[in-house]
């Protein structure tokens, strides 16, 4: 009887050993799988549209639903004489993006002569419910500015437009959240070099060379810059000069005085891509910086997820619909 128990015990131990070895083999196999490099992320910057609702939402610091009032007599005077700035007031019903506590808002729009076809909305929507897209005054003080031209900064307020814009604001908050966003960030030599150059920005003797090299890297540096730009450390060199690529520019270089890493990276991104998501090249408020970072993250998310083929299919669909 005792021998029988010993035999059973030996069999149990043998079985346990086999199971243990199998589990170890499985763990080893999993580890090897984890070591296989992930497929590089492809960023299709050519698929980014020139005009899009998501771009307008990303660029805007504030999106407000309400009733705006414009002095149409003053507007006509400007159009009959010369271009100029016109002040507006807006009675606020709700805020779709941004943090505003007031019930009324003053803002400014530059009116060009001749009147743009889109500017007819100033007359059509005067005194009516509308949705307005705003950015802060680039100078950092004074009234808010409307985003771009009237066509994309002032639209009629309906339940459908409110829903669409509110959904886009929510979506951008979700895709720019760290956990979601960092899944599209690269882990390559360009990103590593960007990290090294950002470190050099804290050394007085190396900062200017870091700015120059980062700009020269061009689009190769863009994903790494955007993924690492949420950096509030002070710069060792708080000035940068970037060549004006616009042939109509009145000076050869634009000169900025960034204060933090995020400020100078925004200036370099604007220089490389030609896209502006805020005016923090000379510093800015925490809210302004945070909105700029979110906007650039939204831009990269679309570059990683919107293929050129998808854009072409959409364009063909639009042509068919027209």
What does each model-found stretch correspond to?
Residues 1-11:
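N-terminal secretory signal peptides that target proteins for export/translocation
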Residues 2, 30-212, 226-227, 246-249, ...:
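Transition segments tied to proteolytic processing and entry into folded domains
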Residues 16-26:
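Bacterial N-terminal signal peptides
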Residues 184, 206-217, 239-272:
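Structural detector for internal amphipathic alpha-helices that build alpha-solenoid repeat scaffolds
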Residues 196, 200, 227-236, 252-253, ...:
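Alpha-solenoid HEAT/Armadillo-like helical repeat scaffolds in large eukaryotic proteins
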Residues 216-217, 228, 232, 271-276:
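Residue-level signature of the C-terminal ends
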Residues 286-321:
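Eukaryotic acidic, Ser/Thr-rich intrinsically disordered low-complexity regions
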């Amino acid at each position: 009887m005792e021998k029988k128990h010993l035999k059973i015990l030996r069999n149990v131990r043998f079985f346990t050993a086999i199971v243990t070895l199998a589990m170890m083999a499985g763990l080893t196999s999993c580890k090897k799988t984890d070591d296989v490099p992930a497929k590089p992320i492809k960023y299709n910057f050519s698929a980014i549209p020139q005009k899009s609702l998501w771009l307008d939402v990303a660029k805007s610091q504030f999106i407000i639903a309400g009733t705006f009032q414009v002095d149409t007599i003053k507007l006509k005077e400007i159009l009959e004489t010369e271009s100029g700035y016109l002040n507006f007031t807006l009675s606020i019903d709700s805020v779709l993006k941004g943090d505003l506590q007031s019930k009324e808002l003053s803002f400014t729009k530059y009116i060009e002569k001749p009147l743009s076809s889109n500017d007819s909305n100033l007359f059509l929507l005067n005194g009516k419910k509308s949705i307005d897209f705003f950015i802060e005054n680039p100078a950092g003080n004074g009234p808010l500015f409307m985003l771009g031209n009237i066509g994309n900064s002032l639209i009629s307020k309906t339940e459908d437009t409110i829903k669409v814009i509110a959904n886009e604001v929510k979506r951008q908050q979700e895709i720019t959240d760290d956990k979601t966003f960092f899944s599209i960030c690269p882990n390559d030599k360009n990103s590593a070099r960007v990290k090294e150059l950002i470190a050099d920005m804290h050394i007085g003797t190396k900062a200017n060379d870091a700015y120059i090299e980062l700009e020269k890297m061009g689009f190769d540096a863009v994903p790494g810059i955007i993924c690492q730009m949420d950096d509030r450390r002070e710069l060792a060199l708080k000035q940068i000069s970037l060549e004006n690529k616009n042939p109509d520019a009145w000076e050869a270089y634009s000169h900025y005085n960034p204060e933090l890493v995020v400020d100078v990276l925004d200036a370099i991104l604007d220089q490389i891509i030609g896209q502006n998501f805020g005016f923090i090249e000379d510093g800015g408020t925490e809210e302004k910086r945070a909105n700029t970072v979110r906007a650039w993250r939204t831009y990269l998310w679309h570059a990683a997820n919107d293929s050129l083929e998808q854009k072409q299919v959409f364009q063909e669909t639009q042509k068919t619909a027209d």
